[in-house]
From Swiss-Prot:
Protein name according to UniProt: Thymidine kinase
Classification via Gene3D superfamilies: P-loop containing nucleotide triphosphate hydrolases (3.40.50.300)
Binding site for ATP: G26, S27, M28, G29, I30, G31, K32, T33, R185
Matching InterPro entries: Herpes_TK, P-loop_NTPase
Single annotated GO MF: ATP binding
Amino-acid positions noted as binding substrate in the UniProt annotation, renumbered to this chain: Q95, R191
Enzyme class at the top of the EC tree: transferase
Quaternary organization: Homodimer.
A Gene Ontology BP annotation from the UniProt entry: TMP biosynthetic process
Keywords annotated in UniProt: ATP-binding, DNA synthesis, Early protein, Kinase, Nucleotide-binding, Transferase
Function: Catalyzes the transfer of the gamma-phospho group of ATP to thymidine to generate dTMP in the salvage pathway of pyrimidine synthesis. The dTMP serves as a substrate for DNA polymerase during viral DNA replication. Allows the virus to be reactivated and to grow in non-proliferative cells lacking a high concentration of phosphorylated nucleic acid precursors.
SUPFAM superfamilies from the UniProt entry: P-loop containing nucleoside triphosphate hydrolases
Catalytic site: E54 (proton acceptor)
Organism of origin: Gallid herpesvirus 2 (strain RB-1b)
Amino acid sequence: MSEPQSWSVMASQMTSAQLIRVYLDGSMGIGKTSMLNEIPTHSLMGVPVLKVFEPMKYWRYYFTDLVTTVNDTCDRRRRGEFSLFQSSMIVTALQSKFADPYLVFHERLSSKCHRITGTRGNPSLILILDRHPISATVCFPIARHLTGDCSLEMLISMIIRLPQEPPGCNLVIVDLHDEKEHVSRLSSRNRTGEKTDLLMLRALNAVYSCLVDTIMYANHICPYSKDEWESEWLDLPWFDTSLATTFINEPRTDYRGSRVSLHHTLLAIFKRRELCAEDGSLSTTHAWILWGLLMKLRNINVERFNITGLSTTKCVESFMDTMSERLVTHSSWNDAFEIEADVLAYNKEMAM
């Protein structure tokens, strides 16, 4: 393999920087961080790879230990020491703090991501991030709601925080179908204050699987088919306790139809009488919120990555081998150098 090109050489060959940014996401303890640690600093073509790690230092040592406190709060709610209202207020406050580092970095990065150049481009920089802001603003809050630790009203407040997505977002949802292996990985981390909560694990896996379908639906329906979405909404059943149990516990299969239906999306969870008129139609404000969620998701290029039976090394090889199929965006060289500086500063202060 030829020696990796330096940034100065690459910059002299291109009028603008070409950026691939990829978010690795999925349930907790699935192996994302291990993958990220093993990803090389340059691709096989010599393209520099920048890695943004999970902000664990911020979560655990800046003010409150969020990991310990959120698990303790949920345990106390289940023991009857907290009411749903009390646990919801605490969990939502903690979940907002989980989201803060993602949102701050996302805002800085968004201003540097310009128009899409397509796929199979010649990138000058690959940026790989451990989780997208959607994890802390949508996926974990929905899972906490499904497990009974967060109320519907607080969940609504969280999903509003999902930021607008600039062009060129590649979101890879890591999947591990072997629950026994997943539990083993989570338990073996042995992190202080972290507990192996099988109900939460199943809820998260279901939410992330459903997220892929939701993004596919958004890509099809937005922004031109709002009437079609509203018609489908009326046909959804009320999401009650039995449907919540089914959602969490029944195995989900990858949707293979020509078009995802609203029934297969996360929005079906919000078909509640508290949010709707008697005929099932959403109140205006909540309709704006859910349609806004779809509009934010529609710029995301999503893919499932099934790592069942694969070693970390094989996962990394497979992930990097498909890099040329992901979206590329234009960025200025000044922006590219700023991204590098931001990543170094963020990892130094936030990561462990």
